[in-house]
């Protein structure tokens, strides 16, 4: 069977939910027995989002092979339950860098290097390579931004050319737009969608399907009007209504036969998607019996997208405990020794996620100290793990000026230090310890119990600093347990205090491996402990 290519574009406004639509379609096609992969095209000129501010971009999602990517890849993995790779996120910066590198090597044999064909050919190669490396039946490619953006033009031209390259029966274009509702007029307005499609058609792409984002149900008259003016079949105008839970969306799209229309267009003769297990999960999610309050003490809490995988992993762990997770967003900059009890006193659990830089770290340390001394379940992630060690050094080992060398290079007690292979690294981008690495678990520890007593787990990392092993014996003598280490025993991966209900922190990012139907072990154990604390109130 020829590989099938589905392209998802957006119009009218950005952040319209293209990624969720693409991920939902991927889940439906996977449940039809097709092997699906998915990728995101980001038209910005950065090589990757690794050095971008979370306020600009949100979370950086890390793949198994160490690519720093767009947060939409997290949605893709969670919805479709697949592990993506470096070919799943392509930026303008990455493409231009590769083309210019080839030009410097003389690989274009003296030709004038141009957007067409050199940039568009490089983009098409990324699409085909993503499908080829995963041996997929279907590849879904989402283009970031909106039609009409200057940055998107080479990407859309590459998508247009794909139809001629692989054949019309193997390509489908899906356009996602906003259908605004004017309260004063009491009606929905189709004109923005019409203009968006007109713009897309002006670039040579005729959409085969429209997905309409809306707050209000769309009547058949509106669908017929859009079908007429945008030249698509009325049944191919799909409503994407706002929902209470994201995981309802695949079921809503299936109810409108979206996946069947896609299969018919691409001439895919495959069974109907069996969504029984997914439906049962959604039913459970919408009828959770308990509630638990988790304080998330972070640096970027004004933008929840900066912690989107953390939030989803907490929710998944809540599902496993039949509990709705309510998140209290605590700005780490506000936390002091004087107000920590007031800010965190109502929390059933405290999570301290990753981050970079000095700002907010002292507040996080106060939150960690409160969790340790008051025996509140606590989970530290990445920088949260490093600060857990710093807090213990300061307040238990009484090393008053202990710190991380990242935060204070002159500290007399560098509990956290630069990794040896990072000493001579000058570039910030793409140089962290990235991707999947193993952690050997200590028998009888809470970490081992969280992972069903496995000897080794593999999780994704994104860091440059590590625990300084010169202090390991001193920590262990005071009851601090290093419950996860690298197989060569050089790198500390997980730490815990066994006397507490749940006081565990890890260097890696467990949230990147969580799925709604298969929650991550440490998160599940953390929420279990938080639910128990909640029941004691």
From Swiss-Prot:
Task: Give the disulfide map.
Answer: none
* Other known facts: CTPSs have evolved a hybrid strategy for distinguishing between UTP and CTP. The overlapping regions of the product feedback inhibitory and substrate sites recognize a common feature in both compounds, the triphosphate moiety. To differentiate isosteric substrate and product pyrimidine rings, an additional pocket far from the expected kinase/ligase catalytic site, specifically recognizes the cytosine and ribose portions of the product inhibitor.
Sample GO molecular function, one term: ATP binding
Q: What is its EC number?
A: 6.3.4.2
Task: Summarize the subunit comment.
Answer: Homotetramer.
What's the encoding gene here? pyrG
Species this chain originates from: Streptococcus gordonii (strain Challis / ATCC 35105 / BCRC 15272 / CH1 / DL1 / V288)
Task: Please spell out the taxonomic lineage of the organism that makes this protein.
Answer: Bacteria, Bacillati, Bacillota, Bacilli, Lactobacillales
What family is this protein classified in?
A: Belongs to the CTP synthase family.
What's the protein called, per UniProt?
A: CTP synthase
Annotated segments matching region Amidoligase domain: 1-268
Q: Which Pfam families match?
A: CTP_synth_N (PF06418), GATase (PF00117)
Boundaries of each Glutamine amidotransferase type-1 domain copy?
A: 293-536
Its pathway?
Pyrimidine metabolism; CTP biosynthesis via de novo pathway; CTP from UDP: step 2/2
